Amino acid sequence: MTKAFDSALRLLTRREYSAMELCDKLKQKGFSTNDVQNALYECQRLGYQSDVRFVENYIRVRIHQGYGPLKIRQELKNKGIDPDLIQSVLHQEKDNWVNYALRAWEKKFKRQDDFSYSEIQKQQRFLLYRGFDRDVISKVFKEVKSSYLI
């Protein structure tokens, strides 16, 4: 095996990388484009590198951290992931986004007693920043209003 392949294996033992990230890392280490492509092909052929596995793990981690589909989608696009792959994996979670947004809201604002108009706007902006769309946010606040009697 080549030095580029060995270097790729060392990187992949630490964490998952997208194909683009792995290529960039190997190029930073000074390997030629041809060596990088060969190492990437070999890693994919042997199942050591998989964009599908990377996307599934990345989405699971980011959901657990309280991020929504819009932010996750943008981050994955920046990592060079195919938009169709992103959409197919995010689509598996489509029924859960309200629960994820509610969990993010509760983590940040559960102890809050102030439900003034400006405070609710601040909380909605927080969820928007986290990557949840307006439909999900409106459902969250309907749930919050019924639960907390706003």
Curated annotation (Swiss-Prot):
GO terms for cellular component: cytoplasm. The keyword Cell membrane does not apply. It holds the Pfam family RecX_HTH1. The keyword Cytoplasm applies. Keywords: Cytoplasm. InterPro entries: RecX_HTH_1st (IPR053926), RecX_HTH_2nd (IPR053924), RecX_HTH_3rd (IPR053925), Regulatory_RecX (IPR003783), WH-like_DNA-bd_sf (IPR036388). It is found in: Cytoplasm. It comes from the Bacteria. One of its GO terms (biological process) is regulation of DNA repair. Its main location: cytoplasm. Modulates RecA activity. Belongs to the RecX family. This is Regulatory protein RecX. It comes from Legionella pneumophila (strain Corby).
